[in-house]
């Protein structure tokens, strides 16, 4: 099934971009999504395979548009096939903040990050769901499992009452 999906994705990318160079896999993350890199003309772009049975791709596109309208730096969705979960998005490259801003510029990075968080917090749009106690509890559960237990191997007992 996976090979069939990758072939369908590669064909879609070829149809959309005219690029027949293929897809270069990017590191996997903790989701059903898979990412690849290819080219569109002279620039690099990211191809996202986000199976629609597990990913809300229409919401992803809507959030991207919402954030871009609010001048929050997020990748532009260049093309999509929401029924199949194929998206072509702007490539921000491989540079991390710590690589972009040299040693000793920690405050500059923190200031930029905080300014962006303030901008995001100020967005009032129905596309952004309210942050509920249930959502917080679910995310705290992920933190307990992935970070505390799996990543650093500590007991979650101090957090059980939160």
Regions found by a protein language model. Name each.
Residues 1-21:
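Juxta-kinase regulatory segment immediately upstream of eukaryotic protein kinase catalytic domains
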Residues 4-8, 58, 161:
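A generic alpha-helix signature
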Residues 20-21, 74, 156:
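Residue-level detector of short coil/turn "hinge" positions at structural boundaries
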Residues 21-36:
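ATP-binding glycine-rich phosphate-binding loop
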Residues 36-137, 142-145, 149-152:
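ATP-binding pocket architecture of kinase catalytic cores
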Residues 154-162:
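Central P-loop NTPase core of STAND/AAA+ ATPases
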